[in-house]
Design a protein with these regions (language model features):
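N-terminal pre-domain/capping segments
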Residues: 1-142
Length: 142
């Protein structure tokens, strides 16, 4: 088993690769290209730049979570074919750059929904949380 840590990238994570490298036993990160729109092809150049950044910190990219899947694929609308082709190209590009593990989800519209991003636990730690009542109160038209 490999010990990894989720890393949101240098633009989006307050935890640096240098800090992750200091955690005993952690050898890699699970990451993604957060500034890439769903359905956009990940070029080999962008993938390689991400890998290089991680490797320069003494870690490696253990996997991707995730390549965002365009809602056209998830909902089955006609324009999905182009996005399926783009997704396949991205997976091929990841493989060519040595990344062989990709986590994915096919949840349409809301994707991974959380209603709270920092619920405080009794010990002072924070966790993600989901409350169905908050979702029920949403107005999708707004």
């Amino acid at each position: 088993m490999e010990m990894t840590l989720r890393w949101y990238g240098s633009k989006f994570d307050t935890v640096t690769l240098k800090q992750i490298r200091q955690i005993p036993g952690v050898t890699g990160v699970i990451t993604t290209l957060y500034d890439t729109a769903p359905g956009e092809i990940w070029s080999r150049e962008r993938i390689r730049a991400m890998i290089n950044e991680v490797e320069e910190a003494g870690l490696h990219v253990s996997g991707i979570e995730s390549v965002n899947i365009h809602d056209a694929i998830k909902t089955g609308v006609p324009e999905r074919e182009q996005y399926i082709d783009n997704y396949i190209t991205t997976l091929e590009n990841l493989g060519k750059e040595g990344i062989h593990m990709v986590c994915y989800n096919f949840m349409p519209v809301f994707d991974w929904t959380r209603t709270e991003l920092a619920r405080v636990r009794p010990d002072g730690s924070t966790v993600l949380a989901y409350t169905q009542e908050a979702i029920d109160a949403l107005d999708p038209e707004k």
